[in-house]
Amino acid sequence: MAAARGRGGQVGTKAKVSLGLPVGAVMNCADNSGAKNLYTIACFGIKGHLSKLPSASIGDMILCSVKKGSPKLRKKVLQAIVIRQRRPWRRRDGVFIYFEDNAGVIANPKGEMKGSQITGPVAKECADIWPKVASNAGSVV
């Protein structure tokens, strides 16, 4: 019998968003956990093809390490949720939207954030999937 595989803290279905953060991308950490930069190591749920880098988008959970920040967080493999990306994507109403930076928040596998507040806006696509992130967001765009 196969082991049951849960979806963690995700709620509902994920909207289709253009992939904007390949493996190796560095993004800002937008919470108050003590990390400054997050280096993308892997993306969850990507099967992949030969010679194609796995990429993440808004609302995806990624595996990352902290490049700048508090010594307690550095040199450890952590999980994070992408909340902003520079690459434009099209919403269902036809509007193209993008942010001025790439940003993520450190979270556990259930989607509960390590920090208690988020600096800057959070994409609506991410807030719909991750309710714990939405509750800590200052503004949802």
Curated annotation (Swiss-Prot):
GO terms for molecular function: large ribosomal subunit rRNA binding; structural constituent of ribosome. CDD domains: Ribosomal_uL14 (cd00337). Keywords: Ribonucleoprotein, Ribosomal protein. InterPro entries: Ribosomal_uL14 (IPR000218), Ribosomal_uL14_CS (IPR019972), Ribosomal_uL14_sf (IPR036853). It holds the Pfam family Ribosomal_L14. GO terms for cellular component: cytosolic large ribosomal subunit. GO terms for biological process: translation. Disulfide bonds: none annotated. Belongs to the universal ribosomal protein uL14 family. This is Large ribosomal subunit protein uL14. It comes from Tetrahymena thermophila (strain SB210).
